[in-house]
Amino acid sequence: MVSWWQALTRAAGRYPWPANVLLYAGFFSGGDALQQVLRGGPADWQHTRHVATVAVAFHANLNYVWLNLLERALPGRAPRTILAKVLCDQALGGPVYVSTFYAGMSILQGKDDIFLDMRQKFWNTYKSGLMYWPFVQLINFSLIPIRWRTAYTGLCGFLWATFLCFSQQEGDGTFKSAFTFRRIKVTNEVEKPSEK
C-alpha cells in the first residue's frame, strides 16, 4: 500500500497534469457506475465510457487549468482569498461544467438536439451544485495542496457524478428527483413477483 501511494505521489510530482486528469476521470466514471448499480438493471458500459470521455477530454483538463489560474489570480489561503476563489469557481466555473457535461453527453449519445438536456436541466442542476460544491471547494482551497486539487475535486466529483449521471438519464437536475428515483426503484422491487 505504501509503495502504491509513493508511486502515485511521485507521478503527481513529475507529471501533475496527467496524474490529476486520470484520477479525476477515474473517480467521475466511478460515480456513473455507482449510479447504475443504484438504479438496478444491467450495466451500461457505453454510458460509462461517454462519462469518462467527457471527463478526460474536457472536465478534468479544464479543472486542472482553472484551479491553477485561480491560484495565480488569487494566491494564498487567507479567508478572504479563499472566499473569493469559491465565489469565482461557482459563478464562472460551475455553469461551464454543468453545460459541457450535458452538451458533451448529448453529442456522444448522438442526440439530435445536443442542447435539449442543458436547456431543460441546467438551472436545477446548477442550483443543486450550489448546495454541494462551495463546501467542497472551501476545503479544497484551504487545505489541499495545489498539485492535488484536481484529484480531490474528482474524488468529490464521484458523488456529484452519481447524481449528475442519474439526472442526465432520468432526473430533472434536482436532488429531489434523485431521491424519488431511489424510492421508485424500491417500489418496483417490492412489486416484482417472486420467482420460484
Swiss-Prot record:
Keywords: Membrane, Peroxisome, Transmembrane, Transmembrane helix. Residues 1-16, 68-90, 168-196 are cytoplasmic. Residues 35-50, 109-150 are lumenal. Residues 16-55 are annotated as: Targeting to peroxisomes. InterPro entries: Mpv17_PMP22 (IPR007248). Its main location: membrane. One of its GO terms (cellular component) is peroxisomal membrane. It is found in: Peroxisome membrane. Coiled coil: none annotated. It is a multi-pass membrane protein. GO terms for biological process: mitochondrial ribosome assembly. The chain crosses the membrane at residues 17-34, 51-67, 91-108, 151-167. Participates in reactive oxygen species metabolism by up- or down-regulation of the genes of antioxidant enzymes. Protective against the mitochondrial apoptotic cascade. Belongs to the peroxisomal membrane protein PXMP2/4 family. PANTHER family: MPV17-LIKE PROTEIN (PTHR11266:SF39), PEROXISOMAL MEMBRANE PROTEIN 2, PXMP2 MPV17 (PTHR11266). This is Mpv17-like protein. It comes from Bos taurus.
